[in-house]
């Protein structure tokens, strides 16, 4: 009996968890091909903050090493950028790290492209020394900058921004957190709790500039970012600017393929898109109007999606109740 062909675009936690669940219940049903844009196997993105803080190494946060893919008969293309999903011919077209074109046919397609950091459109956002905080490459850049420079500015005081600020402070940088609200983590905390947390973080050496709107990032003589200028005319020095201003579902490929998207790839309770051969899980998916950015919902999606791919599709994803944890204070 011919195995079905399953192609997965994306090599992150939600997608690989789906493959793990699928292998448990239908180990021989699919020939699986995975495309990952990063040069690393699947790792725990949540633990990038301890890596930045010097508490863990990159190797410590690898969830599925290269041997796992080989042991499970999965064809893995790392550093490969998928350029097109051809739904008419049911194929995925990608460019590998050597610039060669790869075309792989599918019977089922799983899109797990995650999200991309939102970079506000202020002038200077493309300067050297201006980064987001999303992956191993970003973390390595911040670790390198902390060893060479003094002043860091983190734009955004949500969970990710505060964890970045904490890691940079632990590595010896003078860190200023810039936020356009009255208190930090305003989506999770009320004013009193936000002010209390800010006071604790100030004891750790962080500075805060609240109700601030960035006007531009200014270059120094070397061409690298040197300062952050605000709309009130104030400015502060910055050898490194980490922008943590939120994320956006990565749906460009799906939209280009004509798959219905609305703040994410719209999926039903079995994680299928409007094309029933195409599934989506993780931060790129929008289920009942919500795109989840936390691990627990993504793993719940993975289990339902795997059951349906295995044609044991009685399970339904009903949505998730979420909570968050800030990893900076203890």
Language-model regions: role of each:
Residues 2-75, 167-188:
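Beta1-alpha1 glycine-rich phosphate/pyrophosphate-binding loop at the start
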Residues 1-5, 24, 284-330:
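Mid-to-C-terminal Rossmann-like scaffold of FAD/NAD(P)H-dependent oxidoreductases
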Residues 13-16, 39, 115-117, 137, ...:
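Residue-level detector of alpha-helix initiation sites
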Residues 126-149, 220-229, 233-307:
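FAD-site-proximal beta/loop scaffold in flavoenzymes
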């Amino acid at each position: 009996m011919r195995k079905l062909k399953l192609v997965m675009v994306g090599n992150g936690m939600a997608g690989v968890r789906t493959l793990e669940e699928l292998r448990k219940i239908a180990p021989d049903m699919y020939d699986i091909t995975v495309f990952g844009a990063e040069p690393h196997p699947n790792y725990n993105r949540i633990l990038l903050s301890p890596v930045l803080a010097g508490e863990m190494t990159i190797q410590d946060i690898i969830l599925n090493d290269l041997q796992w893919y080989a042991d499970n008969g999965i064809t893995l293309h790392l550093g490969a950028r998928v350029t097109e999903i051809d739904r008419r011919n049911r194929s995925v077209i990608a460019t590998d790290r050597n610039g060669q074109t790869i075309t792989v046919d599918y019977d089922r397609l799983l899109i797990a492209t995650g999200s991309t950091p939102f970079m506000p459109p202020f002038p200077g956002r493309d300067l050297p020394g201006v980064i987001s905080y999303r992956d191993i490459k970003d973390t390595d850049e911040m670790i390198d900058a902390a060893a060479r420079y003094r002043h860091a500015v983190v734009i955004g005081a949500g969970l990710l921004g505060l964890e970045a600020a904490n890691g940079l402070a632990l590595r010896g940088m003078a860190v200023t957190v810039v936020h356009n609200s009255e208190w930090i983590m305003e989506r999770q905390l009320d004013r009193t709790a936000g002010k209390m947390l800010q006071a604790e973080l100030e004891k750790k050496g962080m500075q805060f500039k609240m109700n601030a709107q960035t006007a531009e990032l200014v270059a120094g003589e070397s061409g690298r970012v040197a300062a952050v200028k605000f709309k009130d005319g104030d400015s502060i020095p910055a050898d490194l600017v980490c922008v943590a201003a939120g994320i956006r579902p990565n749906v460009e490929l799906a939209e280009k393929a004509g798959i219905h998207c609305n703040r994410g790839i719209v999926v039903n309770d079995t994680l299928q898109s409007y094309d029933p051969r195409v599934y989506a899980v993780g931060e790129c998916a929008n289920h009942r109007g919500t795109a989840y950015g936390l691990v627990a919902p993504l793993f719940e999606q993975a289990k339902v999606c795997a059951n349906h791919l295995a044609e044991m599709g009685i399970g339904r994803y009903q949505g998730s109740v979420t909570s968050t944890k800030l990893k900076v204070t203890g």
